[in-house]
Regions:
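Exported/extracytosolic protein signature
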Residues: 1-140
Length: 140
């Protein structure tokens, strides 16, 4: 079973508070938590836990937990974070450049096996983009 929960992170009186994400507006920080539970009688082998980056948001890279996540810009090819790409500089040389977190579209963890009756939880925070809000806390 896979359970995805989305909340909003707000600061009240200097303390972080997690609340329902009924409405999210530009600048808000969303917390997404995905829990994988093995309800079968056998071990799930080679689990791949995936958490898509919600549309109109940017991943807050330091919030990824556990920190062993891989990321993707297309949801198909995953690599260790931070993602890098090769680009041509003004003088024609090929240089390696960090991919901005705004380009990340999906996260994936490879925790190995998940025993019967056990659960694993993965999470990350995302900032709602300033150009378009995610209405009602739902991704587009």
């Amino acid at each position: 079973m896979i359970k995805l929960e989305r909340s909003k992170v707000v600061v009240r009186d200097g303390k972080e508070v997690i609340e329902a994400a009924a409405i999210a507006k530009p600048g808000d920080v969303l917390l997404e938590v995905v829990t994988y539970t093995n309800n079968s009688k056998s071990t799930v082998r080679r689990l791949e836990a995936t958490l898509p980056v919600p549309a109109e948001t940017e991943l807050l890279v330091d919030s990824v937990a556990p920190g062993s996540a891989f990321a993707s810009v297309d949801g198909k090819i995953f690599a260790a974070m931070p993602l890098k790409r090769k680009v041509r500089s003004a003088n024609g040389a090929e240089v390696e450049q960090l991919v901005p977190a705004s380009a990340y579209r999906s996260l994936r963890w490879y925790p190995g096996d998940l025993a019967s009756g056990k659960s694993l939880t993965f999470s990350a925070r995302f900032k709602v983009s300033d150009d378009q809000p995610a209405a009602n806390g739902k991704s587009r």
